[in-house]
């Protein structure tokens, strides 16, 4: 029985603890209910589980536990419902547990909230959800206030148990009151509220009166009562008088007559020890007469709440019982194991609680350190903490109002605690030391504690005697520093140099991350610094719920703090975190240096490159934008040692712009500028030390010295190249890394030195593509780029010379591949270069980039594709062969170079240094920079810089000179020698000396031979490439042009025109090809081609045109006549030939050039027939699918030339000489002659009998009944069937009119009698509404005309009438469905019936000829069409001008002159027309679907000539669908056929192919 009772108690505690586990760490709550655990009564409980992501106990929303046969069984709610405690599975859409929108004051625990007012009393809004305040307890989604023992106001036991374990809510006083556990505890009153005193000794289990019992630890409280070791006390506990406030003993020699005092020296300790009634209540002097107790002594001195909560954790020698203690450092309650049977007092501490709720209520829900300010009452134990300081009461000195849960207490200030007072206003005992050593108790022991010395600002250690003292008493130095740091800084710890706080008098003595707190003289961290610190959970083993500010998300988040080694971004509550870090802007992480701050120390946020000051650029670090220093600014700054922060200093590196090297300097630890690098490599890599054009640093040897390379020095490895770099004012050859080496490095993640890893890109040599990777921010390598475009620019251009980049497609942003075998396959200024990294050719070069003069290119930075800037007053600021040019528009200097390599003015020679073979740059106007005979010159006017060039021209008339291959100097020669200069050059001199230079003998594009026969320095006059002859004796017959004279030529033995200047060459119109090249034209249009594809005629090559921005066919003129081009042989020159002896390639002929030579030129274009096309200069006939071919131009009908045969590409097939899709007709169509035609009704037009119905045929273009059949109700039937049908309709299963001899009106649409209503006129003329013979319905009835002799029979056409006239007359009769002068509404060419649907506006339902049809309204003004008789047009009917076909003209209804409307998918248009949407409206009209060349096409084809007409046939698209009409010559005759496309160079106009002719021709 006893075991069963204990089991019930254990199960009760088990369940009670489980309800409080939610949102607690998993290690703190292991005893929640699980599946298969025992249970007592049937019911349900929420299922709790440990969330592995948060490591917290959570409640399942869809699962729960049900007690079945004394075991908990796991259950699951049905889909769409959630489990709610006390209600079971509920539908959240009917009664939502989580409110989507908060209503003020209506939120329960867990409901969504925005403000505290959205939640009920006792709650606050935490992280968007309503939560209980710390002084309230959760119960069934509501918060109830915790109630102290012996206090009223409880509703549930949990309100009492949260304050003291085992307490219950009793209703013995008609109101719920919390009572201590009966029989085992008694209630005792203190200033902090009532406590429950245990009367049982846990170590022995006895219940004998112990008298001197304290509340804590429960079960061993009698072991911690104060005992003065003085012999006068006789080993009795220190007594007191309950309620007394006396600070001095009333009777000398006796003790316990007042408040708590230490007997040995009389020190008042009543503010740190509570005087509690003995248990049971006795008078100590009477109970213990041998003692020195005063007569009024009736209490025992026990540690106050504030003193108990800062005591250490004591476990005892054999810990076995789980208990909780309050960690004043972390502000949380933590579990430990305790030895309840330990007999010695040194193993017990008042900081010992049975439950976590008791621990939190006792220690957490009060002041952090020290006792609160109490009210003044007559009895001390009746005093209570002041809880309304924020509203009506102000706190006394040394106290500050602090919010704790739902209360506001006056708590000791950190300044009071961290001082000599130690948070004790009544510490009246004088002493010489700042710390209070306490006093030695009978059973206590000494220990080392720490106190804060406000004079030194440091925490010092002292020996604590074990009892008493004050609150400037900390268990560890860390705890002391954490608490008392608030005395110096509002938040965070002061900056320290070793153990001492760094002193300051103003902000200039603190780093920018801190500010000087003048009253304390220390550097405190700024809000920006604290809130930007990363999450640091510490290195200890505790699990404390704290909050930190996530600068990236700008939100406060919870984390588990381990208890030590954290940082300042650590807050006790989410409210503290939010209030302090509100609107804090995180620090952007720059590549180098610190982001820019405003005058208030806040980081400046920019966007889209805007908002940064000079020398700063807008940079995105992966999570935010900030202003970071530019590379040029960083590398130009002087060294800055920064500000002292912390102990010691270090050595860093900076870039010295004067020496252009990285040098070390001593750094004080904080601030400085961005020219600050951790090591030499980082400095050299960032500032590109050594001038390596591709970036990177020069190669160093094993000793760390930079290697020098060259012809006589060490050679560079394959990964580097020997390049002259600028060092100071001189050039030194150094080994610089190649771009291929840099792009071949593996991706290096590096080390994290920023807030987060950032995305970077590297070149993957396996895929030859740029790929992303995560970079830590430091210690990377050269294969690291900010974005994918930088990666492509740098690595795709690795084969290009320095300053040149690969030409990029503006659309794809990828380099364009070129063909090295094709000349000029790259844009102007670019050369086709092989890139081994991507195993392809790219176009390398550069343009002026909008910053360089015309015909010059800029030095392009391959990283960002930007032109390099330079400084005009700094030597060697541009690479070799580049000059510093000024751009007026941008007001900046840029490095520029000639695209063609031109350096000096025309006729001048460039001087090169004999040692480096590099040109000497100079400043124009200075005479001390060039050697003798050379001056500083430039081929550009008004230039600031140039090169050293010869002072005088090399050749006369500034002619070009020949450069010797060996000396790279102008070739010297002597006039009159046999061989001195090669062909095209002549030995000339500026002086009378015979020594001269080889100068070009002709200028411009004219060949050298044009000077033959004329005196020196004169040129012959040419006419169409031939030397023009003249007659000096008869000038009018053979004159010379002006500036030319007729002279005798000794070499040619004739008179010819000679002049000092060559005749101007007629300029050809620009066609986009390079100079001396001609574009191939198709019908006066330049032929466009594809690079690398053989789609240019013979003699032409596919080259890129910069002016036309396209690839086009260009050929070398070579002096060929007219528009022909020369054949270029293996030598790269036009192939020369001899007429009649040399064989030119196919398509070429040996012709005389303008220079007088004979070269292979393309033959002239031949005129081909209309059915032929030119292929490789020859005419070839056009052929259809299945025929042999040479090129696509030959193939017709939409076919293409594949494997020398015209073929149709799938899914098209050859049908009648055309490529068409396989025709699939719908169920209401038939296939005829390759076209789908709608099935026709009787009287409708047809082309084949298959369109007509049963028993009918296509007779002269119309479906008519065959011989022996007559038409009835749209069908062909025999006369017997007609009579039978009429009879059946009349009888209609025996239903007839009530009058004999009367027949009902039959609805032809539904083949049933027409019903009517006897009220009103519901039947047509000639009919009356009668009830049927069965007396069930009313029918429209009329007399049987077949029985009357007065019935008028319509007259038939005379026998002489032709069949066609008979058909047309019948159709006219069929269309006479409206009264005279009124027009029917046509739908798909037929009058619309109104037996089912309503008529459109302007028409009314009218009966005529046994049917109801929509007819135009009679006598409506404005509806009669002028010029027509009885023709009415609806106002809504579109006019021909309003409705238009996509091709051709619409089918017109003559009576209304309007297009015929149709409905797609229902009733189609006549044969030859299709129902398509108008191109000008949403209506569907009948448009032509095929072509006919016959005039009068409408009458013969459709049989509808009297009612349908068409516009001019020429305006109609002659072919169906996408086909066009092509005119060709076949076997000597002209044929017109429909094909897929027009032959080149014709274009389609209105569906017909025409060849546009040039007006000039």
UniProtKB/Swiss-Prot annotation:
Q: Which cysteines are joined by disulfide bonds?
A: 309-363, 333-359, 459-480, 531-581, 540-564, 556-577, 635-687, 645-670, 662-683, 743-795, 753-778, 770-791
What is a single cellular component term in the Gene Ontology annotation?
Answer: extracellular region
UniProt keyword Repeat, yes or no: yes
Q: Does the keyword Mitochondrion apply?
A: no
Gene3D superfamilies associated with the record: Pancreatic trypsin inhibitor Kunitz domain
- Which Pfam families did the record assign? EB, Kunitz_BPTI, Lustrin_cystein
Domain BPTI/Kunitz inhibitor stretches = 309-363, 434-484, 531-581, 635-687, 743-795
GO molecular function of the protein, one example? serine-type endopeptidase inhibitor activity
Q: What is the annotated signal peptide range for this record?
A: 1-18
Q: Where is the WR1 domain?
A: 365-412, 487-525, 588-629, 690-737, 798-845, 850-897, 902-950, 953-1000, 1012-1059, 1071-1115, 1118-1162, 1177-1209, 1223-1266, 1295-1342, 1376-1416, 1443-1488
Localization in the cell: Secreted
Q: Which InterPro entries match?
A: Cuticle_assoc_divergent (IPR053014), Cys_repeat_1 (IPR006150), EB_dom (IPR006149), Kunitz_BPTI (IPR002223), Kunitz_BPTI_sf (IPR036880), Lustrin_cystein (IPR028150), Prtase_inh_Kunz-CS (IPR020901)
What keywords are annotated for this sequence in UniProt? Answer: Disulfide bond, Protease inhibitor, Repeat, Secreted, Serine protease inhibitor, Signal
Q: Which SUPFAM superfamilies match?
A: BPTI-like
Q: Which PANTHER family match?
A: PROTEIN CBG06944, PROTEIN CBG15282-RELATED
What protein am I looking at? Answer: Uncharacterized protein ZC84.1
**Originating species:** Caenorhabditis elegans
């Amino acid at each position: 029985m006893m075991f069963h009772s204990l089991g019930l108690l254990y199960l009760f505690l088990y369940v009670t603890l489980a309800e409080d586990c939610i949102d607690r760490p998993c290690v703190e709550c292991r005893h929640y209910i699980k599946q298969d655990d025992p249970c007592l009564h049937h019911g349900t409980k929420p299922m709790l589980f440990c969330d592995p992501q948060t490591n917290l106990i959570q409640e399942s929303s869809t699962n729960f536990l049900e007690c079945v046969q004394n075991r908990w069984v796991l259950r699951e709610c049905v889909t769409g419902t959630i489990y709610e405690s006390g209600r079971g599975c509920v539908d959240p859409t009917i009664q939502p547990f989580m409110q989507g929108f908060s209503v003020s004051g209506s939120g329960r625990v867990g409901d969504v909230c925005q403000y505290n007012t959205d939640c009920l009393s006792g709650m606050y809004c935490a992280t968007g959800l309503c939560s209980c305040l710390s002084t309230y307890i959760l119960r069934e989604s509501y918060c109830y206030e915790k109630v102290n023992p012996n206090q009223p106001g409880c509703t549930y036991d949990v309100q009492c148990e949260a304050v003291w374990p085992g307490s219950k809510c009793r209703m013995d006083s008609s109101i719920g009151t919390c009572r201590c556990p009966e029989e085992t505890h008694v209630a005792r009153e203190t200033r902090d509220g009532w406590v429950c005193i245990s009367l049982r000794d846990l170590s022995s289990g006895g219940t004998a009166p112990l008298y001197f019992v304290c509340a804590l630890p429960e079960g061993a409280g009698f072991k911690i009562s104060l005992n003065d070791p003085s012999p006068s006390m006789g080993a009795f506990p220190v007594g007191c008088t309950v309620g007394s406030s006396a600070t001095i003993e009333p009777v000398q020699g006796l003790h316990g007559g007042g408040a708590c005092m230490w007997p040995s020296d009389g020190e008042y300790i009543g503010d740190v020890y509570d005087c509690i009634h003995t248990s049971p209540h006795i008078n100590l002097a009477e109970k213990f007469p041998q003692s020195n107790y005063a007569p009024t002594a009736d209490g025992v001195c026990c540690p106050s709440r504030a003193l108990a909560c800062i005591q250490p954790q004591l476990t005892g020698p054999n810990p076995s019982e789980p208990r909780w203690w309050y960690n004043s450092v972390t502000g949380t309650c933590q579990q430990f194991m305790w030895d309840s049977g330990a007999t010695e007092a040194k193993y017990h501490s008042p900081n010992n609680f049975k439950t976590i709720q008791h621990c939190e209520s006792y220690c957490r829900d009060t002041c952090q350190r020290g006792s609160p300010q109490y009210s003044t009452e007559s009895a001390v134990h009746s005093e209570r903490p002041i809880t309304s300081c924020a509203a009506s009461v102000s706190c006394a000195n040394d106290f500050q109002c602090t919010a704790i849960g739902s209360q506001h207490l006056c708590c000791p200030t950190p300044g009071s605690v961290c001082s000599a007072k130690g948070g004790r206003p009544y510490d009246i005992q004088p002493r010489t030391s700042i710390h209070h050593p306490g006093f030695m108790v009978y059973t206590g022991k000494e220990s080392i504690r720490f106190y804060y010395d406000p004079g030194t600002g440091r925490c010092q250690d002292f020996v604590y005697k074990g009892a008493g003292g004050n609150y400037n008493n900390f268990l560890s130095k860390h705890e002391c520093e954490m608490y008392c740091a608030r005395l110096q800084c509002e938040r965070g710890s002061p900056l320290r140099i070793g153990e001492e706080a760094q002193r300051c008098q103003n902000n200039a003595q603190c780093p920018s991350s801190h500010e000087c707190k003048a009253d304390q003289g220390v550097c405190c961290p700024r809000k920006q610094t604290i809130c930007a610190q990363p999450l640091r959970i510490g290195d200890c083993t505790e699990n404390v719920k704290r909050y930190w500010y996530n600068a990236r998300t700008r939100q406060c988040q919870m984390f588990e703090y381990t208890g030590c080694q954290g940082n300042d971004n650590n807050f006790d509550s989410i409210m503290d975190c939010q209030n302090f870090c509100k609107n804090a802007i995180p620090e952007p992480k720059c590549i180098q240096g610190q982001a820019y701050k405003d005058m208030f120390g806040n980081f400046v946020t920019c966007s889209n490159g805007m908002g940064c000051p000079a020398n700063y650029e807008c940079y995105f670090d992966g999570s935010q934008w900030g202003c970071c220093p530019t590379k040029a600014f960083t590398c130009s700054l002087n060294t800055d040692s920064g500000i002292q922060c912390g102990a010691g200093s270090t050595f860093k590196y900076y870039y010295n712009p004067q020496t252009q090297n990285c040098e070390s300097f001593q750094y004080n630890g904080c601030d400085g500028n961005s020219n600050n690098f951790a090591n030499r490599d980082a400095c050299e890599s960032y500032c590109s030390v050594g001038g390596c054009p591709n970036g990177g640093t020069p190669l160093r040897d094993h000793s760390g010295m930079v290697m020098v390379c060259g012809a006589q020095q060490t050679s560079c490895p394959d990964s580097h190249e020997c390049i002259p770099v600028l060092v100071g004012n001189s050039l030194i050859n150094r080994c610089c890394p190649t771009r291929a080496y840099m792009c071949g490095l593996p991706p290096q993640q590096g080390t994290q030195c920023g807030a987060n890893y950032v995305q970077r890109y590297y070149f993957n040599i396996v895929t030859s593509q740029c790929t992303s990777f995560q970079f830590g921010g430091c210690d990377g390598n050269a294969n690291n780029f900010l974005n994918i475009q930088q990666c492509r620019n740098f690595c795709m251009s690795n084969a290009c010379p320095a300053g040149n980049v690969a030409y990029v497609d503006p659309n794809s942003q990828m380099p364009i591949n070129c063909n090295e075998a094709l000349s000029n396959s790259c844009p102007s200024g670019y050369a086709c270069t092989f890139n081994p990294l991507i195993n392809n050719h790219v176009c390398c070069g550069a343009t002026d980039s909008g910053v360089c003069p015309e015909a010059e290119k800029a030095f392009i930075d391959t990283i960002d594709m930007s032109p390099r800037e330079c400084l005009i007053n700094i030597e060697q600021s541009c690479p070799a062969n580049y000059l510093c040019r000024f751009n007026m528009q941008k007001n900046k200097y840029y490095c520029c170079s000639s695209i063609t390599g031109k350096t000096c003015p025309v006729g001048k020679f460039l001087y090169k240094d004999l040692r480096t073979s590099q040109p000497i740059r100079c400043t124009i106007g200075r005479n001390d920079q060039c050697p003798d005979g050379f001056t500083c010159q430039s081929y550009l006017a008004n230039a600031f810089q140039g090169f050293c060039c010869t002072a005088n021209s090399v050749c006369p008339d500034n002619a070009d000179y020949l450069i010797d291959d060996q000396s790279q100097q102008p070739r010297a020669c002597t006039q009159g020698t046999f061989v001195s200069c090669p062909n095209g050059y002549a030995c000339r001199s500026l002086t009378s000396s015979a020594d001269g230079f080889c100068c070009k003998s002709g200028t411009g594009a004219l060949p050298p031979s044009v000077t033959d026969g004329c005196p020196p320095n004169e040129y012959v006059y040419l006419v169409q490439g031939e030397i023009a002859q003249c007659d000096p004796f008869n000038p009018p017959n053979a004159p010379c042009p002006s500036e030319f004279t007729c002279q005798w030529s000794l070499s040619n033995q004739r008179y010819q025109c000679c002049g000092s200047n060559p005749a101007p060459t007629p300029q050809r119109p620009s066609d986009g090809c390079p100079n001396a090249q001609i574009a191939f034209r198709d019908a006066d249009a330049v032929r466009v081609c594809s690079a690398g594809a053989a789609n240019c005629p013979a003699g032409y090559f596919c080259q890129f045109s910069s002016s036309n921005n396209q690839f086009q066919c260009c050929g070398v003129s070579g002096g060929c006549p007219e528009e022909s081009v020369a054949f270029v042989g293996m030598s790269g020159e036009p192939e020369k030939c001899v007429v009649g002896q040399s064989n030119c390639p196919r398509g070429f002929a040996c012709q005389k050039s303008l220079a007088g030579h004979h070269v292979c030129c393309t033959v002239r274009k031949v005129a081909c027939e209309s059915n032929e096309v030119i292929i490789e200069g020859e005419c070839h006939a056009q052929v259809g699918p299945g025929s042999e071919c040479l090129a696509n131009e030959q193939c017709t009908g939409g076919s293409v030339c594949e494997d020398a045969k015209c073929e149709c590409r799938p899914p098209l097939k050859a049908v009648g000489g055309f490529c068409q899709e396989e025709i699939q007709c719908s169920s209401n169509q038939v296939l005829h002659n390759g076209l789908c035609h709608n099935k026709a009704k009787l009287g409708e037009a047809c082309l084949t009998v298959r369109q007509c119905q049963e028993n009918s045929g296509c007779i002269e273009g119309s479906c008519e009944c065959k011989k022996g059949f007559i038409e009835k109700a749209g069908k062909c039937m025999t006369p017997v069937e007609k009579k039978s049908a009429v009879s059946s309709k009349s009888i209609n299963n025996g239903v007839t009119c009530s009058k004999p001899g009367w027949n009902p009106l039959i609805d032809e649409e539904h083949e049933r009698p027409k019903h009517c209503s006897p009220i009103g006129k519901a039947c047509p003329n000639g009919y009356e509404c009668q009830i049927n013979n069965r007396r069930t319905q009313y029918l429209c009835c009329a007399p049987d005309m077949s029985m009357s002799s007065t019935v008028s029979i319509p007259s038939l056409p005379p026998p002489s009438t032709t069949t066609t006239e008979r058909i047309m007359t019948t159709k006219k009769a069929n269309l006479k469905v409206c009264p005279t002068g009124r027009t029917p509404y046509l739908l798909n060419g037929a009058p619309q019936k109104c037996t089912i649907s309503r008529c459109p506006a302007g028409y009314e339902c009218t009966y005529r000829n046994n049917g109801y049809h929509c007819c135009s309204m009679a006598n409506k003004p404005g509806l009669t069409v002028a010029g027509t008789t009885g023709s009415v047009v609806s106002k809504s009917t579109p006019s021909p001008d309003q409705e238009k076909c996509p091709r051709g003209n619409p089918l017109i209804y003559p009576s209304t002159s309007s297009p015929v409307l149709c409905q797609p998918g229902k009733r189609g248009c006549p044969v030859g027309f299709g129902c398509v949407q108008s191109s000008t409206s949403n209506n569907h009209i009948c448009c032509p679907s095929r072509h006919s060349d016959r005039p009068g096409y409408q009458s013969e084809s459709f049989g509808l000539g009297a009612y349908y007409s068409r516009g001019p046939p020429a305006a109609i698209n002659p072919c169906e669908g996408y086909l066009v009409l092509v005119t060709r010559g076949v076997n000597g005759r002209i044929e017109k056929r429909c094909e897929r496309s027009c032959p080149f160079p014709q274009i389609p106009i209105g569906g017909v192919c025409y060849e546009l002719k040039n007006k000039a021709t």
